[in-house]
C-alpha cells in the first residue's frame, strides 16, 4: 500500500522546504496578526505582558499539537512580542551535549531558544537542559583522565520554547520544567478561510469567498495544508485565465488532486479501506496497521491518525483501532451493522 510518503501528500501536514519558504513569507509578526488559536493567544498575551512589566525573561514554553498548526510561527511571534532574538534549532539537529552548550552560550539575556521536535532530543542533551532551564547554569566537563573536572558556567536568563507533536514522549523531568504548556488545536473553517484570504493577498492572487470556504473545509484544520492547496488551486485558475479563483475551479482542482469533501486523500482512503475490507472495520492493532501501510507505528500515530480521530473516522479501543460508521458512509460502503 505504501506508494505516497508524507512529504509527497498534498494534504500532508509535515513541513517541506517549499512549505518553509511559503510560511516565512506569510509569517505574522504580532499576536494580533496571528489568526486562530484564540485560547493560546489570550493566555500568551497575559504571560508576555507580565514578563515585560517585571523586566524578566518569559517562562519556558511548551507548544504541542499535530504538525502544521503554526507552532514555529507562534514561537517567532512570542520572541518578537518580547522584543528579543530567537535562535532556532531542532531536537535531531542537536546531536551531542556540546552542540547544546554552544547554542546556550550564544544567548543574550531574555533571548529565546526554540527547539522543534523537542521530544527527539538525545538523553545526554536533555540532561544538560535541566540545570539550564531551572537555574540558568551548565556544568561543562573539561580535561582528561585524572585532570577531568566540571566547570560551572552561568547563563543569562533565557526562554526555551519547545515544540512537539508527541508531548507524551517527553520525559517528566523535562516536561515539568516548562512553566507554560499550550495545546495547539486544529483550526476552524472560519479561521482557515481568513488565513486563505490573507495568504491570497501575499500570493498576489484573488479568490472568491465561496471558493475560500470550500478550500478551508478540505484543509484538514491545518494552515500548512490550506496554503499548499491554495497554491495548487491558483495554478489551475491561472491556466484557465480566471481573474479570481472560483468555486467551480476549486472543486475541480481538488477532485483532480483526489482531496475529497472531508479533506481525505487517496492514502487516507486506502488505509480505511484496508481496515474495512481486510479486518471487518476493526479493531485492528496499531502494529498490524503499520505493517499493512508500510510505516512504523510512530508515523501512524503522528501522521495518519490525528485527523482521522479528530474527524471521527476511526476510534481507539483497548484492542486497537476501529473504523466508524461515518467512514463507511464516506467511502460508499453499507453501514457495518447491515453487512
From Swiss-Prot:
The subcellular localization recorded is: Cytoplasm
Locate the residues binding ATP: 26-27, 68, 71-73, 134-136, 177, 187, 224
Q: Name one GO cellular component term.
A: cytoplasm
Q: Please give the residue ranges the record annotates as the region Head domain (RuvB-H).
A: 261-339
Q: What is its EC number?
A: 3.6.4.-
Presence of the UniProt keyword Hydrolase in the record: yes
Entries under Pfam families matching the protein: AAA_lid_4, RuvB_C, RuvB_N
Q: Where does DNA bind?
A: 316, 321
Query: Which keywords does UniProt give here?
Result: ATP-binding, Cytoplasm, DNA damage, DNA recombination, DNA repair, DNA-binding, Hydrolase, Nucleotide-binding
- According to the record, the residues making up region (Small ATPAse domain (RuvB-S)) are 188-258
- Molecular function GO labels: ATP binding; ATP hydrolysis activity; four-way junction DNA binding; four-way junction helicase activity
Span of the signal peptide? none
Q: Which residues form a coiled coil?
A: none
Instruction: Output the GO biological process annotations, alphabetical, semicolon-separated.
Output: DNA recombination; DNA repair
Provide the primary localization: cytoplasm
HAMAP family xrefs: DNA_HJ_migration_RuvB
Entry remark concerning the domains of this protein: Has 3 domains, the large (RuvB-L) and small ATPase (RuvB-S) domains and the C-terminal head (RuvB-H) domain. The head domain binds DNA, while the ATPase domains jointly bind ATP, ADP or are empty depending on the state of the subunit in the translocation cycle. During a single DNA translocation step the structure of each domain remains the same, but their relative positions change.
Q: Which family does it belong to?
A: Belongs to the RuvB family.
**Chain's role:** The RuvA-RuvB-RuvC complex processes Holliday junction (HJ) DNA during genetic recombination and DNA repair, while the RuvA-RuvB complex plays an important role in the rescue of blocked DNA replication forks via replication fork reversal (RFR). RuvA specifically binds to HJ cruciform DNA, conferring on it an open structure. The RuvB hexamer acts as an ATP-dependent pump, pulling dsDNA into and through the RuvAB complex. RuvB forms 2 homohexamers on either side of HJ DNA bound by 1 or 2 RuvA tetramers; 4 subunits per hexamer contact DNA at a time.
Protein known as: Holliday junction branch migration complex subunit RuvB
What organism does the UniProt record list as the source? Lactobacillus johnsonii (strain CNCM I-12250 / La1 / NCC 533)
